[in-house]
Structures are given as C-alpha cells and as structure tokens.
Amino acid sequence: MKRLNKLVLGIIFLFLVISITAGCGIGKEAKIKKSFEKTLSMYPIKNLEDLYDKEGYRDDEFDKNDKGTWIIGSEMATQNKGEALKVKGMVLYMNRNTKTTKGYYYVNAIKNDKDGRPQENEKRYPVKMVDNKIIPTKEIKDKNIKKEIENFKFFVQYGNFKDLSKYKDGDISYNPEVPSYSAKYQLTNDDYNVKQLRKRYDIPTNKAPKLLLKGTGNLKGSSVGYKDIEFTFVEKKEENIYFSDGLIFKPSEDK
C-alpha cells in the first residue's frame, strides 16, 4: 500500500512539474508576442514618412528634447550549396527631429577562407529619402543596382501581422541574464507574409519558412538592444535562405 501511495504521489508530482513548466512556457510566449506586437501592429506602413509622426518606446536613454530616430532594415540572403552567401538589403535612419532620412543599400558576398573564417565583400551605396522616394546620393554606374534601389520596398511597407495571435506552440527561448528571448513558428506557404516575400524575391525553394521573433533587452520595452524578425526557408551547412527585417526606435545621434 505504501509503495502504491509513493507511486501515486510521484505521478502527481511529475504532473505538477510538467504543468508548471508548460505554464511558464505559455506565459513567456505571450510576453514575447506582446513585446513584438507594439511594433508589429504598426505594419504595414506604406508611406515611410508617416514614421516621422509616430513615437516608439522611450526610456531614460532619451534626452527630453529628442524625438528619436527610427531605424529600418530589410535584407534577403541566399546561399546555394558550396557557394558564397549573397546578401542584399537596405538600412534607413529616420530622424524625427529634423524629419530627414539617410541610409545605404548594400550588397555582400560572404564566403569562408581556407581556415573556415568568413570573408565579407560588402559594397555600400548611400541613399536618402525625399517625398517617400529612395534616391542614391552618389552616382551609380551599375544600372541593375540603381534599379534595385529605386524599386526597393521594406518589409514594414507590405508585411502584416494581424494574425500574430494565431501562431501557436512556438519554440520559446528566454535568458533573463542577457536578457534575450525568441519565439519560433513553422509557417505554411499560404501565410500572407510568405506569399508577399515570394512575390517580391526569387526564393529558390518550395519549403515553407519558419518565423523567428528574436530580441534583446527588457521584454517590457527598452531602447538598448534590438528586435528582429526572420523568415528562415533553409538553414543548413553551406546552404541558407532567409529574409530578415527590423524596425527599432533609438535616441538620435544629433539631437
């Protein structure tokens, strides 16, 4: 009888541990989603200049007279097996104090040397934004690059996360010491954002991607750290296909 009671108590204890662990996971997932929703609920912003009138999270890092700067970045990376990782993207710095935007378009080819160390070959093309149009600030002789800049759209302009709450059972990671956190979800090719990416980029795989929400800093909000979203289509040794995007609010360098 005593053995039976011990067995029952052991099962109950194990059940409680599993329940508490699962509950903590669900709680962290909800907090991570809530942290990202503050920014993702703004998507899509078709006219980027609307960000001049939008304020992000402010903390003690901001001067009281500083309206802050939005930093936008989107990039597509593709690596066929045995080849270099080819990356194309753009970063803009939107200063709300001066209502001016500058940044750069970049092209990179990353390949490991004989010792396995990654060697980059990044080229940057400075740009500015006027009347919601992105314009090179220096002459570009390469017509293809010039056209890519003129036609470039940030994910924030067409992405939509109204169904973020429907993403369930994600792989959750949280490290309170850094702090860092992430949530990963398996998507389908019918997902709205996946369709939008395939519409705009030549993605050489039919595999549906995983959506990764990752960040550092206080979950409740912080100007220190970052928040990124990533759509990972392929992740293998010497073979990768992913799209990453970020929209963060930081103190301005020139007040």
Swiss-Prot record:
Localization per record: Cell membrane
Signal peptide location: 1-23
GO cellular component annotations of the record: plasma membrane
Keyword Lipoprotein: yes
InterPro entries: Csa, Csa_sf
Lipid-binding residues (covalent, N-palmitoyl cysteine): C24
Topology in the lipid bilayer: Lipid-anchor
Claim: Membrane is one of the keywords in the record: yes
Ranges that cross the membrane: none
Primary location recorded for the protein, binned into one broad class: membrane
Residues linked to a lipid group, S-diacylglycerol cysteine type: C24
Gene3D superfamilies given in the database record: 2.50.20.40
Keywords: Cell membrane, Lipoprotein, Membrane, Palmitate, Signal
Pfam families: DUF576
Similarity annotation: Belongs to the staphylococcal tandem lipoprotein family.
This protein's name: Uncharacterized lipoprotein SAOUHSC_00054
Organism ancestry: Bacteria, Bacillati, Bacillota, Bacilli, Bacillales
